[in-house]
Amino acid sequence: MLQPKRMKFRKMFKGRNRGLANGTEVSFGTFGLKAVGRGRLTARQIESARRAMTRHVKRQGQIWIRVFPDKPITSKPLEVRMGKGKGNVEYWVCQIQPGKVLYEMDGVPESLAREAFALASAKLPLKTTFVTKTVM
Protein backbone atom coordinates (compact mmCIF):
# COMPACT_ATOMS: atom_id res chain seq x y z
CA MET A 1 0.00 0.00 0.00
CA LEU A 2 1.17 3.53 -0.74
CA GLN A 3 1.99 5.84 2.15
CA PRO A 4 4.77 8.32 2.99
CA LYS A 5 7.95 6.89 4.50
CA ARG A 6 8.11 9.65 7.10
CA MET A 7 6.31 12.89 7.83
CA LYS A 8 7.18 15.90 9.95
CA PHE A 9 3.80 15.64 11.74
CA ARG A 10 1.79 12.45 12.20
CA LYS A 11 -1.72 13.96 12.08
CA MET A 12 -3.25 16.60 9.84
CA PHE A 13 -6.23 18.96 9.84
CA LYS A 14 -9.22 17.89 7.74
CA GLY A 15 -8.89 20.88 5.41
CA ARG A 16 -10.93 21.60 2.28
CA ASN A 17 -10.72 20.16 -1.22
CA ARG A 18 -11.20 23.27 -3.35
CA GLY A 19 -9.49 24.74 -6.39
CA LEU A 20 -8.16 23.33 -9.64
CA ALA A 21 -5.80 20.42 -10.15
CA ASN A 22 -2.15 20.34 -11.12
CA GLY A 23 -1.04 17.52 -13.42
CA THR A 24 -3.89 17.80 -15.92
CA GLU A 25 -1.89 16.70 -18.98
CA VAL A 26 -0.82 13.20 -20.01
CA SER A 27 2.95 13.49 -19.71
CA PHE A 28 4.52 10.03 -19.31
CA GLY A 29 2.36 7.64 -21.34
CA THR A 30 0.07 7.87 -24.37
CA PHE A 31 -3.30 7.26 -22.67
CA GLY A 32 -4.60 8.50 -19.34
CA LEU A 33 -7.46 8.27 -16.86
CA LYS A 34 -8.56 11.77 -15.82
CA ALA A 35 -10.81 12.67 -12.87
CA VAL A 36 -13.97 14.59 -13.78
CA GLY A 37 -15.25 15.12 -10.24
CA ARG A 38 -13.56 15.97 -6.97
CA GLY A 39 -13.08 13.70 -3.99
CA ARG A 40 -10.43 11.64 -2.31
CA LEU A 41 -8.82 8.31 -3.12
CA THR A 42 -7.58 5.95 -0.45
CA ALA A 43 -4.35 3.99 -0.85
CA ARG A 44 -6.43 0.80 -1.12
CA GLN A 45 -8.51 2.19 -3.99
CA ILE A 46 -5.41 3.34 -5.87
CA GLU A 47 -3.83 -0.11 -5.51
CA SER A 48 -7.04 -1.95 -6.41
CA ALA A 49 -7.42 0.01 -9.65
CA ARG A 50 -3.74 -0.53 -10.49
CA ARG A 51 -4.12 -4.29 -10.05
CA ALA A 52 -7.24 -4.39 -12.23
CA MET A 53 -5.41 -2.55 -15.05
CA THR A 54 -2.23 -4.63 -14.75
CA ARG A 55 -4.18 -7.91 -14.89
CA HIS A 56 -6.24 -6.80 -17.88
CA VAL A 57 -3.24 -5.79 -20.01
CA LYS A 58 -1.48 -9.02 -18.92
CA ARG A 59 1.58 -7.09 -17.73
CA GLN A 60 2.44 -5.70 -21.16
CA GLY A 61 3.09 -2.02 -21.67
CA GLN A 62 3.79 0.33 -18.79
CA ILE A 63 1.53 1.97 -16.18
CA TRP A 64 2.24 5.15 -14.23
CA ILE A 65 0.41 6.14 -11.05
CA ARG A 66 0.19 9.95 -10.99
CA VAL A 67 -1.34 10.30 -7.51
CA PHE A 68 0.09 9.59 -4.08
CA PRO A 69 -1.81 9.32 -0.77
CA ASP A 70 -0.04 11.81 1.49
CA LYS A 71 -2.85 12.83 3.85
CA PRO A 72 -3.48 10.79 7.03
CA ILE A 73 -7.09 10.17 8.09
CA THR A 74 -7.64 9.51 11.78
CA SER A 75 -10.55 7.90 13.61
CA LYS A 76 -11.32 7.05 17.20
CA PRO A 77 -12.16 3.46 18.21
CA LEU A 78 -15.80 2.37 18.56
CA GLU A 79 -17.65 3.22 21.77
CA VAL A 80 -15.09 5.78 22.94
CA ARG A 81 -16.34 8.98 24.56
CA MET A 82 -15.73 12.33 22.93
CA GLY A 83 -12.59 14.23 23.83
CA LYS A 84 -9.26 12.76 25.00
CA GLY A 85 -7.46 13.89 21.86
CA LYS A 86 -7.45 13.09 18.18
CA GLY A 87 -7.73 9.44 17.10
CA ASN A 88 -5.09 7.22 15.55
CA VAL A 89 -4.16 7.27 11.84
CA GLU A 90 -6.37 4.68 10.12
CA TYR A 91 -5.55 5.13 6.44
CA TRP A 92 -4.02 7.51 3.88
CA VAL A 93 -5.81 9.47 1.16
CA CYS A 94 -5.01 11.65 -1.82
CA GLN A 95 -7.25 14.64 -2.46
CA ILE A 96 -8.36 14.87 -6.10
CA GLN A 97 -9.56 17.97 -7.94
CA PRO A 98 -11.31 17.89 -11.34
CA GLY A 99 -8.92 17.49 -14.28
CA LYS A 100 -6.23 15.52 -12.42
CA VAL A 101 -4.68 12.65 -14.40
CA LEU A 102 -4.75 9.61 -12.10
CA TYR A 103 -3.10 6.89 -14.21
CA GLU A 104 -1.20 6.75 -17.48
CA MET A 105 -0.47 3.85 -19.82
CA ASP A 106 1.79 3.24 -22.80
CA GLY A 107 2.82 0.33 -25.02
CA VAL A 108 -0.69 -1.11 -25.52
CA PRO A 109 -3.37 -0.58 -28.22
CA GLU A 110 -5.98 2.10 -27.53
CA SER A 111 -8.86 -0.41 -27.33
CA LEU A 112 -7.04 -2.43 -24.65
CA ALA A 113 -6.18 0.75 -22.73
CA ARG A 114 -9.85 1.85 -22.80
CA GLU A 115 -10.98 -1.52 -21.42
CA ALA A 116 -8.32 -1.48 -18.69
CA PHE A 117 -9.21 2.08 -17.64
CA ALA A 118 -12.92 1.15 -17.57
CA LEU A 119 -12.11 -1.67 -15.12
CA ALA A 120 -9.98 0.69 -13.03
CA SER A 121 -12.68 3.37 -13.06
CA ALA A 122 -15.18 0.91 -11.57
CA LYS A 123 -12.90 0.59 -8.53
CA LEU A 124 -12.74 4.35 -7.93
CA PRO A 125 -15.31 6.58 -6.17
CA LEU A 126 -14.86 9.40 -8.74
CA LYS A 127 -16.23 10.00 -12.21
CA THR A 128 -13.39 9.65 -14.69
CA THR A 129 -12.78 9.96 -18.42
CA PHE A 130 -10.32 8.47 -20.92
CA VAL A 131 -7.80 10.92 -22.42
CA THR A 132 -4.98 10.63 -24.95
CA LYS A 133 -1.75 12.58 -25.25
CA THR A 134 -2.08 15.69 -27.40
CA VAL A 135 0.78 16.08 -29.88
CA MET A 136 1.72 19.68 -30.66
Swiss-Prot record:
**Annotated protein name in UniProt:** Large ribosomal subunit protein uL16
Q: What does this protein do?
A: Binds 23S rRNA and is also seen to make contacts with the A and possibly P site tRNAs.
Note the Pfam families from the entry. Ribosomal_L16 (PF00252)
Instruction: Show the taxonomic lineage.
Output: Bacteria, Pseudomonadati, Pseudomonadota, Gammaproteobacteria, Alteromonadales
Q: Does the keyword Transferase apply?
A: no
Is Plastid among the key words of this record?
Answer: no
Protein family membership: Belongs to the universal ribosomal protein uL16 family.
Keyword annotations from UniProtKB, A to Z = Ribonucleoprotein, Ribosomal protein, RNA-binding, rRNA-binding, tRNA-binding
Give the transmembrane region(s). none
Q: Which InterPro entries match?
A: Ribosomal_uL16, Ribosomal_uL16_bact-type, Ribosomal_uL16_CS, Ribosomal_uL16_dom, Ribosomal_uL16_sf
GO biological process annotation, one example: translation
Q: Which organism is it from?
A: Shewanella frigidimarina (strain NCIMB 400)
Q: Which GO terms describe its cellular component?
A: cytosolic large ribosomal subunit
